[in-house]
């Protein structure tokens, strides 16, 4: 498939108004809870926290409070994605593959943290779409 076509297909998919089933939304909520657990557990280790924060935010017993001090979506995305990936990679053999769907949730967090007008339903829908896009590209 030509790169241009992939870009167009993804863009078209992202601009469609799709209503996901309750089953899809429930599965996504569980995935989100898993990711939050990964972030929290990874924050209990010094190495990933030092790397994720570049040593700039000191130690904090709640990894989610660190976000309030961050200046940009990019910084939030990097921080949450590193913690998620670090724990997933060290926790389960399947996450050692080249891409894991929860890798993308940090990006969604970064975006939605700075777009307060968005709601949880839109957040969950974006996660479903990220999973579907990554799954199709992986095939």
Task: Describe each region flagged by the PLM.
Residues 1-139:
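N-terminal core-entry segment
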């Amino acid at each position: 498939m030509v790169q241009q076509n992939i870009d167009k297909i993804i863009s078209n998919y992202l601009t469609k108004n799709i209503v996901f089933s309750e089953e899809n939304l429930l599965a996504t909520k569980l995935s989100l809870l898993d990711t939050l657990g990964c972030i929290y557990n990874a924050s209990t280790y010094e190495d990933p926290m030092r790397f994720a924060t570049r040593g700039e935010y000191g130690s904090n017993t709640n990894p989610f409070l660190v976000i309030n001090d961050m200046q940009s979506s990019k910084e939030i995305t990097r921080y949450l994605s590193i913690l998620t990936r670090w724990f997933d990679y060290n926790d389960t053999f399947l996450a050692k593959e080249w891409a894991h769907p929860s890798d993308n949730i940090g990006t969604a967090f970064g975006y939605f943290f700075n777009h307060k007008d968005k709601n949880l339903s839109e957040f969950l829908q974006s996660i479903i779409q990220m999973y579907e896009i990554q799954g199709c590209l992986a095939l």
